[in-house]
Swiss-Prot record:
Signal peptide: none annotated. The lineage of its organism: Bacteria, Bacillati, Cyanobacteriota, Cyanophyceae, Synechococcales. This is NADPH-dependent 7-cyano-7-deazaguanine reductase. GO terms for biological process: queuosine biosynthetic process; tRNA modification. GO terms for cellular component: cytoplasm. It comes from the Bacteria. Substrate binds at Y72, E73, L74, H91, E92. Gene3D superfamilies: 3.30.1130.10. Belongs to the GTP cyclohydrolase I family. QueF type 1 subfamily. It comes from Prochlorococcus marinus (strain MIT 9215). The gene is queF. Catalyzes the NADPH-dependent reduction of 7-cyano-7-deazaguanine (preQ0) to 7-aminomethyl-7-deazaguanine (preQ1).
Amino acid sequence: MSTAKLDDSTQRPLYGERIIKESKIICFENPNKKRIYEISIDLPEFTCKCPFSGYPDFAKLNIIYQPNLRVYELKSLKLYINNFRDIKISHEEVVNRIMDDLLSAGSPHWIHLNASFNPRGNVSMQLDIFSGQKKN
């Protein structure tokens, strides 16, 4: 192993880590408020840590929603989701926290959040949360 002294730039948080840590869900104006339509977003690389073992948990998140006045901006959503990768949190708590933040940021007519956690120890878990009234 090298004993070379690290320069200051390698000891500070990297710019990507800073951006992820400071991220919030951003929305923009719905371009067609008069039309009812659904948006589906897949986030296949979600990670957080088990609060009991510290082992990583992996999941695929799927968000389906009918926007009201605002639409979720995808890059900010990706960065927000990446912020959970080092947080020790249960499946139930993290999915409810994400739903709360989605509702707070976008106030959709209707939203469904599905989290499909990869098997660990021969057990997989799927969580579904709904909010609002779906319009036809």
